[in-house]
């Protein structure tokens, strides 16, 4: 079978080594004669899986000891509700930065629980979409927290700055599409959350990193399954967790460690992004509408000069083993998601195809 590279934005490509190991262990995990999917989440065998996964995740991000790691249900959208329900306390407002589709989705959900102060950070620089630098974000005095999305998968927009608003500002962020792709100073945040299906593992699992002094503040109407304190007190097993997704994510963490950790992965991700953007920028046939300072290294949207060729591009690229390149319906065009598991060989195959396609159709 010819090699296939999956450029899906999520559920996304998983490391080949991880899939191979999971396949080998699927029916007989560690000699038990049963699958890891079938063992009790409260048994000693799975508890070991859970503890190792958390420790490896902590090691990869150098998470300080005063932060708790929660393995949750609900995805990023679940945390759009979980953040205000856990952090508002007796306040009625929070600051929300709007820089793209997912930030706006978080704002929409937050309006059910508070009156968000919206910081519109979208700007245009030399005709390209961009984001205001953090120093220009006007924070309100009475906000319970600040929320933003560092990487917009649909828009292909990234905010690479590290927040520095002082110790009084509780910064929360949706790292679903960029976590583990670059070094991250966890101590600058109150809450970090990430759906697993892009850079962590399969869909169904959500990781939350929460500073321990923020526990115990959930609204009385907060569902128990979203209550950080309840989840922490029960070691993320208040109800049956998504055990197979947890196990596979643990394998991904070990794979990341074997690659040299997050710093090494960051260098590879930079190389992949530079390769792809280089082909786009050196062509009149392809274009990307995001300012260079805010270009995502994870999600690269691009348009063809003639959108009548979109269907042909997608058909031919799929036949060449380059899958899931169709852009989101909101923006159209193409999108290549090049998360950690995408090898540089996959990006090289894509750029070679793009150059050849332009030669034949340009």
Swiss-Prot record:
It is an enzyme of class 2 (transferase). Its EC number is 2.6.1.52. Keywords: Amino-acid biosynthesis, Aminotransferase, Cytoplasm, Pyridoxal phosphate, Pyridoxine biosynthesis, Serine biosynthesis, Transferase. GO terms for cellular component: cytoplasm. Pfam families: Aminotran_5. The keyword Cytoplasm applies. Binds 1 pyridoxal phosphate per subunit. Its cofactor is pyridoxal 5'-phosphate. L-glutamate binds at residues 9, 42. InterPro entries: Aminotrans_V_dom, Aminotrans_V_PyrdxlP_BS, Pser_aminoTfrase, PyrdxlP-dep_Trfase, PyrdxlP-dep_Trfase_major, PyrdxlP-dep_Trfase_small. GO terms for biological process: L-serine biosynthetic process; pyridoxine biosynthetic process. SUPFAM superfamilies: PLP-dependent transferases (SSF53383). It catalyses: O-phospho-L-serine + 2-oxoglutarate = 3-phosphooxypyruvate + L-glutamate; 4-(phosphooxy)-L-threonine + 2-oxoglutarate = (R)-3-hydroxy-2-oxo-4-phosphooxybutanoate + L-glutamate. GO terms for molecular function: O-phospho-L-serine:2-oxoglutarate aminotransferase activity; pyridoxal phosphate binding. It is found in: Cytoplasm. Pathway: Amino-acid biosynthesis; L-serine biosynthesis; L-serine from 3-phospho-D-glycerate: step 2/3; Cofactor biosynthesis; pyridoxine 5'-phosphate biosynthesis; pyridoxine 5'-phosphate from D-erythrose 4-phosphate: step 3/5. PANTHER family: PHOSPHOSERINE AMINOTRANSFERASE (PTHR43247:SF1). Homodimer. Catalyzes the reversible conversion of 3-phosphohydroxypyruvate to phosphoserine and of 3-hydroxy-2-oxo-4-phosphonooxybutanoate to phosphohydroxythreonine. Belongs to the class-V pyridoxal-phosphate-dependent aminotransferase family. SerC subfamily. This is Phosphoserine aminotransferase. It comes from Salmonella paratyphi B (strain ATCC BAA-1250 / SPB7).
């Amino acid at each position: 079978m010819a090699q296939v590279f999956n450029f899906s934005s999520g559920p996304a490509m998983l490391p080949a080594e991880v899939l191979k190991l999971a396949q080998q262990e699927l029916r007989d995990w560690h000699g038990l004669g049963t699958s890891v999917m079938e063992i009790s989440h409260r048994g000693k065998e799975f508890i070991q899986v859970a503890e190792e996964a958390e420790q490896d995740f902590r090691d990869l991000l150098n998470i300080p000891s005063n932060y708790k790691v929660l393995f949750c249900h609900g995805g990023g959208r679940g945390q759009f509700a979980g953040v205000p329900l856990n952090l508002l306390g007796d306040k009625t407002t929070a600051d929300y930065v709007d820089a793209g589709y997912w930030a706006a989705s978080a704002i929409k959900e937050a309006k059910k629980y508070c009156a968000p102060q919206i910081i519109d950070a979208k700007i245009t620089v030399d005709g390209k979409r961009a984001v205001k630098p953090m120093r220009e974000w006007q924070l309100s005095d009475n906000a319970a927290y600040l929320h933003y999305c560092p990487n917009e998968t649909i828009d292909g927009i990234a905010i690479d700055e590290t927040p520095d608003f002082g110790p009084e500002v509780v910064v929360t962020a949706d790292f679903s599409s960029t976590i583990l792709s670059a070094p991250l100073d966890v101590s600058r945040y109150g809450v970090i959350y990430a759906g697993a299906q892009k850079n962590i593992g399969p869909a169904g699992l959500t990781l939350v990193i929460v500073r321990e002094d923020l526990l115990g503040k959930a609204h009385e109407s907060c569902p128990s399954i979203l209550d950080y304190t309840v989840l922490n007190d029960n070691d993320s097993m208040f109800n049956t967790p998504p055990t197979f997704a947890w196990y596979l994510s643990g394998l991904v963490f070990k794979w990341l460690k074997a690659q040299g950790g997050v710093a090494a992965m960051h260098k590879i991700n930079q190389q992949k992004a530079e390769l792809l953007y280089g082909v786009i920028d050196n062509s009149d046939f392809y274009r990307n509408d995001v300012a260079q300072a805010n270009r995502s290294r994870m999600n690269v949207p691009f348009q063809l000069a003639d959108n009548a060729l979109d269907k042909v591009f997608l058909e031919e690229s799929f036949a060449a083993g380059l899958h899931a390149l169709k852009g989101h319906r909101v923006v159209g065009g193409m999108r290549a998601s090049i998360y950690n598991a995408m090898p540089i060989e996959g990006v090289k195959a894509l750029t070679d195809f793009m150059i050849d396609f332009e030669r034949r159709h340009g």
